[in-house]
């Protein structure tokens, strides 16, 4: 499928109905929650046998079942990071959708836990799509993105589609090349991304990135602006809320 591609071998990584939902806007965590996630450092992040395998085109419809062959629930935390703990118990597979949850928790290691799902293997140039409904609430961040980092022996390259719960009338397009953030822009949507499901996408070429909303081109990044990421990355879906250092960006958690 190469509706908007400019390179002949244009792959499509498409995900089906994907709903990001914050539970009662970061409600208190129930006491019966699953055991705490593991502490991780850069050398001991979750890995699998497909970690350096480049994946091919796929269309995945989340429909009530956890496909462990192709997906991995994150269940770890960084001890010295402003990011939350990632807990497998906050990734829910419903009959016709995936739901990710973020919650407050009273523990010694993190104040907030979020849900994250990773696609196994690595993916490169192509079109990435997600059909999703973002989570409302100040402090929440709903995202689909590609990512790699030093734990995989790579530079920090990343391409983001993000929604801040404090203002869901805008989409945040953003990317990193070799650890440097580039091209951060907030794109008006003309609707509230938490009210209904929409199709969001980006097309990643060696020399350009294009972002789409409901198949409408809304932003383009070119190397004349900043360097384009080149390293293959993991495909990630997550919902989170950060610590104090993130408040000026994402808002005060509800």
Regions found by a protein language model. Name each.
Residues 3-4, 10-16, 27-254:
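GH16 jelly-roll
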């Amino acid at each position: 499928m190469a509706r908007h591609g400019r390179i002949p071998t244009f792959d499509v990584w498409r995900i089906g109905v994907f709903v990001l939902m914050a539970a009662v806007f970061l409600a208190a965590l129930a006491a019966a929650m699953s055991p705490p996630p593991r502490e991780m450092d850069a050398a001991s992040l979750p890995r699998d046998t497909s970690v350096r395998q480049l994946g091919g085109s796929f269309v995945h419809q989340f429909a009530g079942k956890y496909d462990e062959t192709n997906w991995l629930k994150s269940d770890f935390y960084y001890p010295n990071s402003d990011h939350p703990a990632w807990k497998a118990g906050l990734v829910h597979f419903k009959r016709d959708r995936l739901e990710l949850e973020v919650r407050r928790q009273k523990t010694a290691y993190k104040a907030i836990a979020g849900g994250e799902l990773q696609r196994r293997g690595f993916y490169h140039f192509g079109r990435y799509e997600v059909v999703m409904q973002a989570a409302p609430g100040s402090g929440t961040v709903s995202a689909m993105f590609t990512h790699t980092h030093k734990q995989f022996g790579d530079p920090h390259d990343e391409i983001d589609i993000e929604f801040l719960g404090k203002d869901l009338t805008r989409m945040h397009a953003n990317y990193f090349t070799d650890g440097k953030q580039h091209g951060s822009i907030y794109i008006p949507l003309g609707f509230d991304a938490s009210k209904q499901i929409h199709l969001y996408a980006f097309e990643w070429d060696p020399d350009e990135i294009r972002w789409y909303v409901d198949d409408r081109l809304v932003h383009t990044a070119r190397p004349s602006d900043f360097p384009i990421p080149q390293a293959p990355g993991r495909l990630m879906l997550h919902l989170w809320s950060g610590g104090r250092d993130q408040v000026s960006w994402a808002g005060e958690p509800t």
